[in-house]
Amino acid sequence: MLFLVHMIVQIPPDADKAFTDALKAEEKAFSQQLQRDGKWRHLWRVVGEYANYSVFDVGSNDELHELLSALPLFPYMQISVTPLAQHPSAIVAN
């Protein structure tokens, strides 16, 4: 199942820098492992924002929820999810 996920990160401006740096490092390692595992298929930055659009390939809604809620930055994210389906005019199967 493919899902388009929009993530907006909103870390409080007064958050401890050492804490947020460590959190960002954990987030990077975790997200890169999900990419290597084929679960996080695409990751695109939104220009001028601390946000991204991503495509996840997971087995269920519950699996996606578990992955997203396990992200180290999850408590600081606003997330919206859109389920995707193959378009009949697409020349490449997804």
Give the predicted meaning of each segment.
Residues M1-N94:
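Conserved, structured core segments of small domains
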